């Protein structure tokens, strides 16, 4: 999910299990655990910086991204109703392009450590059947940035299905207008090409 660098920098390093609502704990463990695991790899990449090749950092990050985010659900919500009509092969190609783009975005945005500190709120809140994990990045100077993960408990466990910047701005909603315009003709090929191109630019050093 593509976000500006300062809005992406977050971590879930110190969330005690006892602070979680009983309902969330009863439904399959800690909703923040996938985010904590993601951030372990993110912080390692940030410390390593550009001395480590982009491809190596992306390869290290991809499993954590796939565990932290329900990428098929995010993609389907971003594309909208046309997604269901795509052939299975097209869906698979689109998901691979979206996954590569998502991993490239996080890899590019987390390529250095500049004195930021990362926090996560000790309490979560319910959003229907979902749970919202609230995090902040506190820069060396300036105002903290709030970034909420909307976590859903499905067969694979807790995964994020959206990110809310400042607690309100849905990344899926922002992404939706972009994606849907590219599949307006019912063909996923333009979106696949766009995601592939953008991932390539990120790998080459272009920042989003």
How does the language model describe each region?
Residues 144-173:
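Short beta-strand edge/turn micro-motifs at domain boundaries
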Residues 30-106:
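Early exported N-terminus immediately downstream of N-terminal targeting peptides
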Residues 164-208:
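Low-complexity, intrinsically disordered terminal/linker segments enriched in charged
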């Amino acid at each position: 999910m593509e976000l500006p660098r300062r809005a992406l920098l977050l971590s879930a390093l110190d969330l005690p299990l006892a602070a979680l609502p009983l309902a969330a704990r009863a439904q399959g463990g800690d909703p923040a655990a996938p985010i904590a695991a993601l951030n372990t790899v993110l912080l390692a990449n940030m410390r390593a910086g550009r001395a480590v090749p982009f491809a190596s950092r992306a390869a290290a990050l991809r499993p954590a991204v796939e565990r932290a985010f329900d990428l098929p659900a995010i993609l389907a919500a971003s594309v909208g109703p046309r997604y269901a009509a795509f052939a299975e092969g097209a869906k698979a190609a689109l998901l691979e392009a979206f996954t590569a783009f998502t991993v490239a975005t996080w890899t590019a945005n987390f390529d250095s450590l500049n004195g930021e500190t990362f926090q996560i709120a000790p309490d979560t809140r319910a959003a229907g059947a979902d749970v919202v994990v609230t995090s902040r990045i506190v820069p060396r100077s300036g105002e903290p940035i709030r970034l909420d993960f909307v976590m859903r408990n499905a067969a694979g466990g807790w995964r994020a299905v959206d990110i809310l910047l400042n607690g309100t701005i849905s990344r899926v909603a922002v992404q939706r207008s972009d994606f849907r315009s590219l599949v307006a003709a019912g063909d996923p090929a333009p979106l696949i090409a766009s995601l592939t191109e953008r991932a390539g630019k990120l790998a080459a050093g272009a920042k989003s």
